[in-house]
Amino acid sequence: VKTPDFFPILSLLPQRALGFIKEQYPQRFISAFLDIFDAMWKNGKDVSVPETLAKTLQPRFSSEEVKTILSSSSSAPYKQRLNDATKEALDRGAFGCPWFWVRNAEGTEEPFFGSDRYAPTPSLSLSTAV
């Protein structure tokens, strides 16, 4: 993992796309997240560029699904959902990235900052990651 030359990026598009994927294709959410992560942090691809994000999603989604993901990501409801999630993160005390709000099997929740090396793992259930 290395920081790409073009970092930082405006990550709104990939975040909104993941929000749509989580809602519409929940069984593929984690794999799509990892695909996007790998594209940027391992392969140096700028996933904020729509064409690059589309290519990143194509192995896991049909061409029609990718078109729907990208178009829905720019729609008002998904823009608002990301705004709401960002507000919730700030209200919970988030002050940087990565910020994870983790819930264990007993329902106990706890925030973690800068602990991305722990996620995603099978033992953690991420309720909110910003």
Named regions from a protein language model:
Residues 1-40:
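Structural alpha/beta surface segment adjacent to cysteine/selenocysteine redox centers
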Residues 35-130:
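C-terminal cap of thioredoxin/glutaredoxin-like
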